[in-house]
Curated annotation (Swiss-Prot):
CDD domains from the UniProt entry: AdoMet_MTases
Keyword Ribonucleoprotein found: no
Name of the coding gene: rsmC
Entry protein name: Ribosomal RNA small subunit methyltransferase C
Functional summary from the UniProt entry: Specifically methylates the guanine in position 1207 of 16S rRNA in the 30S particle.
Subunit annotation: Monomer.
Length: 342
């Protein structure tokens, strides 16, 4: 099953005949593999780890699958397809990345849902691309085409990072935020509640849904001897977290994980402001899986503490998995849930 943007690309796949194709920011479908019907070869770079895991089992000699904020090589392509990102500030970064990998006069295709901001594509395209031309309008999506007409500046993460000081209960820390990663540039209420009641931890600790590394840096500021692991599904968040830790002279293991699936062993502590805020059935089930898996991966005497929107149905799930839990603090928007393993 292809998403609507992918169906629009298939409608126009004749422009890819015998091309070496790169697909950037692809979705959780098999579009890159489907393009092998016409393309010479396809490489796919996912910025969402779920999307990578969906496609990776289909890799073959003509289809290479990658996850991250950049490719691990400098290969050039006849066509680069960009899925317009949900986080609009990420779009210019993806265009710069596309330009690094296009042959001279190579083809750029940009697809996105009408409501997702792709309509502003012509204004957003950098000057090293020709003016964007609308190629198709179908499935509530738009497809634009362009070509590389000039040399693009070399891509440097520092050009796409905002760095700022953040005051936390543990002291001031430096945060590095790449484009496309959510940031309020001040401590949000949920994280502030969590950090204001941070337990004393020891040993191996997991920061689930680490984002740009705010909780990780605050944790290590207060408790620098922790063996910390930071996981997320977003490539830009993981890169931001690594930059944040480096800026503060801290070290932790930072890696992608689908829930806790890519973690191993048990933890002495699990801390999170989990990224489940919308109350949708899909994210509620992910949240429930996180709670259930956490219960299995907590060491004896291990501490589990998360902050969550008080209107979300966490209490029943947590009570079912952990039995007894405490609410050390709450306000009108958030609750702090805490549990210590027997």
């Amino acid at each position: 099953m292809l998403t609507n943007p992918s169906q629009v690309i298939i409608r126009n796949q004749e422009t890819l005949s015998q091309h070496k194709v790169l697909v950037l920011n692809h979705e959780a479908d098999s579009l890159p593999k489907a393009l092998l019907d016409v393309a010479q070869s396809v490489d796919a770079l996912a910025l969402d780890y779920h999307h990578y895991l969906h496609l990776a089992p289909q890799a073959n000699a003509k289809l290479r699958c990658y996850f991250g904020h950049q490719l691990p090589h400098q290969d050039k392509y006849d066509t680069v397809i960009v899925y317009f990102p949900k986080a609009k500030p990420l779009a210019p970064y993806l265009f710069n990345l596309a330009a690094q990998h296009l042959v001279a006069d190579g083809q750029l295709l940009v697809v996105g849902e009408n409501k997702g901001g792709v309509k502003s594509l012509v204004k957003l395209l950098p000057k090293y691309f020709a003016t964007g031309v609308k190629l198709d309008n179908a499935r509530h999506c738009l497809l634009f085409g362009s070509s590389l007409i000039d040399t693009a500046p070399e891509i440097k993460l520092s050009d796409w990072t905002s760095q700022y000081q953040l005051a936390t209960p543990q002291g001031n820390i430096t945060i590095c935020n790449l484009v496309g990663v959510f940031s309020e540039k001040h401590l949000d209420q949920g994280t502030e509640l969590l950090l204001s009641h941070l337990p004393t931890l020891s040993g191996r600790v997991l920061d689930f849904g680490c984002g740009a590394g705010v909780i990780a840096a605050a944790l290590l500021k207060a408790q620098p001897t922790l063996s910390l692991e930071c996981i997320d599904i977003n490539a830009m968040a993981l890169a931001s977290c690594e930059l944040t830790l480096a800026a503060n002279g801290m070290t932790a293991k930072v890696y992608p994980s689908d829930g806790l699936a890519q973690t191993s062993g048990k933890f002495d502590g699990i801390i999170s402001n989990p990224p489940f805020h919308d109350g949708l059935a899909s994210t509620t089930s992910i949240a429930q899986s996180f709670v259930a898996d956490s219960a299995k991966q907590l060491q004896s005497k291990g501490i589990w503490q998360i902050v969550a929107n008080r209107h979300l149905p966490y209490s029943d799930t947590i009570a079912a998995e952990f039995g007894q839990l405490t609410v050390p603090a709450e306000n009108n928007k958030y609750k702090l849930y805490s549990f210590q393993q027997a």
